[in-house]
Amino acid sequence: MHRSIFLACLALAACAAGGVADPFYVHVNPSLRTAYHSRARIVEDRPMLMTLTRAGFDTKNVGDFGKVGFWNWTVSSLTDRRATRHRHALNEMDYGVFWTYVWDFGRLDDTWRGWGLTTDVMKDWLTFEGYSHPARLAKTNASISEWRLAQSLDNPYLTPFYLVRRGLHPHDWLYVQTGVRRVFALTDTLSLTPLFFAECGSENHFERRYGAKPGGGRYRSGLMALNLSLELAWRVSDAATLYAGVHQFGIAHDDARARVKANPAPNARRDLTIGTVGVRFRF
């Protein structure tokens, strides 16, 4: 029921955006990835199709309140492997609402032009109804409810950022991602973006992602994994940008690495290089 309401609102926003470019907008980002990385873990080590859609309303015409809207994230597998575990298309569908606000430091003084603080607050529901695994059939595991808070200090030099995700139901956990990125303009339409980030988590989050600690006891909250990525983007037009990237993932916690190494599952990877190609549409 909640998903149907969300998708209906998303479609309505898309139609509005098609007729009135301002203040409504829709961003759609389909991408092909050689693996699926999420919250310090390789969830799938096979090709996946992922699509992120954000439909929103910019309040700038009625007041300086930022942007509000809906978002949707879908995951589909592109191979037959693990077909007994979940269906191919839309085996995961996440959705939620968001509020985004950009504080432009240039308002204070021209010296700060190009600097700003972007804040993104989201309420999410992650659903896994395409799974046939017994753990996913239990009602308490049918979906995950969480909050997200993300901020970045945008500037022409090196942009630091962080993301906090708090799991509420059915499990209580805390995940923190923090890093830096830099966009290098190669030409008017071509850019290169290196990005580095660390992933940290609470004790409960360690157990949810990796399983019980080897030898018993509990994990300590702290660093989980390190990531380095490089993206090359080509802006074809104001409405479309093509991009390709490579992402190196590695678990940084010794006990977690030992636990994953002992896991016989084919997607239990301690380190992995992930390739991505995609397109970003803005309407």
Model-derived segments and spans:
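Flexible, solvent-exposed coil segments and beta strand-coil junctions
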Residues: 21, 28-35, 72-77, 154-163, ...
